[in-house]
Each structure stands twice: as C-alpha cells, then as structure tokens.
Amino acid sequence: MAGGGGGGGGVAPPLKHDGLEPHPVKDQLSSISYCITSPPPWPEAILLGFQHYLVMLGTTVLIPTYLVPQMGGGNEEKAKMVQTLLFVSGLNTLLQSFFGTRLPAVIGGSYTYVPTTLSIILAGRYSDILDPQEKFKRIMRGIQGALIVASILQIVVGFSGLWRNVVRLLSPLSAVPLVALAGFGLYEHGFPLLAKCIEIGLPEIILLLLFSQYIPHLIRGERQVFHRFAVIFSVVIVWIYAHLLTVGGAYKNTGVNTQTSCRTDRSGLISGSPWIRVPYPFQWGPPTFHAGEAFAMMAVSFVSLIESTGTYIVVSRFASATPPPPSVLSRGVGWQGVGVLLCGLFGAGNGASVSVENAGLLALTRVGSRRVVQISAGFMIFFSILGKFGAIFASIPAPVVAALHCLFFAYVGAGGLSLLQFCNLNSFRTKFILGFSVFMGLSIPQYFNQYTAVNKYGPVHTHARWFNDMINVPFSSKAFVAGILAFFLDVTMSSKDSATRKDRGMFWWDRFMSFKSDTRSEEFYSLPFNLNKYFPSV
C-alpha cells in the first residue's frame, strides 16, 4: 500500500544533504567581465563595438532584402533602405543608451513589423502604378505614415508612466515565458535559414562553438581573446571560405535560390550603394496616411513594446545590472517610440525594437559595457554614410547570419529561464502558469502561421486587411502570446498572502519596484548630465 507503514501517514524521513546546497540566487550575474558601468580598454572596446555592428547587420540587411523587391525597388533602392535603417539604428541606440533605459541594448530593425509592412505593400491602391521606382516611393511613403502614427502609442504609454504601472505587476514568474520565447521563439530565423546553404552555415556554427566554448578551455589566458571575439574570427574565416567557393565556380550550375543564399556577390549592395550619402528625413517624399494601416501598425507597435520589455530584462542580466525598475522600463519604451518615429521620418521601411541577437552577444562575450554599444552605434552611423564600405560588410551570406542567430537566440532564451531561480518550482501554481503559457505561446502562433502558409491569409480574414493584421499579427508572436498569458494568469490567480508572493518571486523583485529603494539602481540607470534633477525616476 503506497505510503503505508507505521502510522506515519507516508511522511518521508528527513534527507541528509551531506553538505549539498542549492546554487545561490543572484540578482546580478557575477561572471561578467565588464558590467554596464565599467568599460573595457579603448582598443578592446572598439573591436567589441565593431562586433556588435557586424551582428546587427544581419537583420538590417535581411529585412530590406525581403521587402524591397516586392515594393518594386532594385539594388539601388535596397542599398538606400539598408543605409537608412542602419543610420536610424545608430541614432536610436545612442538615444536609448544615453536617455532611455541606459542599458547596453542595440536598437535595430524588427521582424515583428514585417507582416504589416507587407500588407501595406500589397494594398490595392499601389497595383496600378507601372513605374517600379515610383511604386517603391509611394509604398515607402505609406509605410512612413503608418510608422509615424504607430510611434505615438509607445511615446504616450512610455512617457506618461502608464507602462510603469503595468510593469509593477510583472513578477519573475510571468517574465520567464516572455523573455524565454523572445529568444527561443525566433527559431525559424536560425537553422531553417542556415540550411539554405549548409556548406557555409554549418562551418560557421561549428567554428563559433569552437572559438567561444572549447578553445578557451584548452588555451587559458587572462585576455580571453577567443571567446570574446569569436564572432569576428569565425565570420572572417567562413566569409573567405565562401568567397573562394564563389570565385571557384562552385555555384555556377546551381539554382537561383542556392546562388542567392551561398554566393558572396549576389546581394547587389556594393554595386547599388553610393560612395557617400547621408540619409535625411522625407527622402522619399512626404508621408501618406491611411487610417486602417495606421491602426494595424499601432497593434504591431504594441506587440513590439511587449517583446522589447522582455529583451530589456535579459539585457540587464547579461550586463550584470540589477532588474530595471518599472520607471526605467517605461522611460525606455518612450524613447523606443521616438525611435519608431525616426524610422517613419527617415523612411527606414521598418520599426525600431531591441535587437535580440545583440542581447545574446552580451552573454557570449560577457561584456555588458554601455560604452561598447555606444561605439557600435558610431560604426552604424559611420558605415551608413560611407555606403560602399558599409556594403562590403553587409554582403555576408544569410546562412552565416543564421548561424550566429542559433547561438544568440539560445542565450536570450536561457536568460529567460534563469529567472526561475527567483520562483518556487515546487508550487503547482508555478508549474501551471509556466507550462500553460509556454505551451500556448508556441501552439497558438503555430496555428496562425501554419494557416497563413497554407491559405495565404490568416485565420481572421475579412475585407479589411488592416483589421486582419490587428488580430493575426499579435497572435503570431510567440513572446507576445506567452507573455500576455503568463501575466494575466499570474495577476488573476494571485492572493495577497506572503507565500504566494514568495512563489512568484516578488520577494526578490520588490526592492527594485521603486527607483530609490536600491542604491544600485541609481548607479546603473540614472540619466547623464545631471538630468535626474529635472526628470526624476520614481
């Protein structure tokens, strides 16, 4: 009989630990070489900044490569769009690191905005335009108008303090699904893209693992050169290897898709880029506004806001900072809205969001310095103006970028799981909220994406394309679905007793709910130039 015996009611005898203790809970990671406020020496900081620039180039190039041909543009338009997105990303990264969250977060393009942007591209009012260049400009101006209106949502929600009040209800438990799927949820941009040219992508991921995980254990030294600069080493080697395959005629008789993925001379960016060009506002003409498209883009802006909140949290972990107070996250969201506004004004063709891959790079290098990311922003602006030189680096084959994503997205996902250390995993309430939100965060978007792939339109299919996007796009985001579900369940299923608060991990995060309740918050997140006196955080 189970649990029978002796009148003890099945109570197990106390276990002998023999000196075994659980790992200590840490609100700051101690194994980071340079934290948010401690910059490396200048030569090392410049190389690390260039490495961040290389990593963010992937998304910066892939998004225009996908969108521009459908807009009617050619290599010249694609090069200009890449330059503009790069230029605005540099500005946004500087603004975020100086006045926003002050975290070492790179602000770049986002895949979240792509479906709604594609809906604008396919709008019927552009189908009668025969001149490809005129069609490109007209569509770009429509995208600009939608982005300008969408930016208002993040600006108002962030600077009004509304997002601060929402984030105060966020616990470590509800943050886990959001942060974890902000990384793991991007798996389709990893190996599936890498496999389009396996002979280039596979060597890249193998070399990246060797340089970052194995060689440092074989060759021990104080400088930690190999794991800190693993991206530069591996990308240069595979890039040369891919170029040798290209000039050697390895892809001469292959299909178009293989040549596009594998060859180093197929991007068209070098030939399409001018030597020197400074992007400027309204370069494509005055923006046009369409109410439905603006509402659809605002819905996407809200999804991006939630995804970015999760990424900010994991960036703070990898920068060895304390959890950002709600007022700091709200401030960051407001400046991110300014970033979306700049994307609309300059005509970047995409919105601004926190770069998940660069967040993963912080974990790989174990350098969370704010100065490094500011240097990378300098590289973005510099190479966006010197078009030809920037295009050389931007011609890295997409499978090489995908190999980097495999590692960096995994780091971000693992950073989300690490928040479980604050929670009680023996609680069935914790198990339910965690398991259900993660499962549904994978299952619901899978249904929406699979339905769209088969039918060429989403489950919500009305005559109003903008309304379809307002429903279909949010439910196609894994981090959004998981984060919203976990947040809702955690808040509505909570009781006021201290045991439940402890299970949720709030005992650990309570001290960071107010800016002044922990002295480290002022060290990491106070505004520069004594601006805290005029814009105090609460």
UniProtKB/Swiss-Prot annotation:
UniProt-annotated stretches for the region Disordered: 1-20
Q: In which tissues is it expressed?
A: Expressed exclusively in ovules.
Comp. bias (Gly residues): 1-11
GO (cellular component) term, any one: plasmodesma
Matches recorded under InterPro entries: NCS2
The answer to whether UniProt assigns keyword Transmembrane to this entry is yes
Keywords of this protein's UniProt record, alphabetized? Cell membrane, Membrane, Transmembrane, Transmembrane helix, Transport
Q: What's a Pfam family this protein contains?
A: Xan_ur_permease
Annotated localization: Cell membrane
Q: Which residues cross the membrane?
A: 45-65, 81-101, 103-123, 143-163, 166-186, 191-211, 229-249, 295-315, 372-394, 398-420, 432-452, 471-491
What membrane topology does the annotation report for this chain? Multi-pass membrane protein
* GO terms of molecular function: transmembrane transporter activity
State where it is primarily located.
membrane
**Keyword Cell membrane included in the entry's annotation:** yes
What PANTHER family does this protein map onto?
XANTHINE-URACIL / VITAMIN C PERMEASE FAMILY MEMBER
- NCBIfam families, alphabetically? NCS2_1 (NF037981)
> What family is it from?
Belongs to the nucleobase:cation symporter-2 (NCS2) (TC 2.A.40) family.
The protein, known as: Nucleobase-ascorbate transporter 7
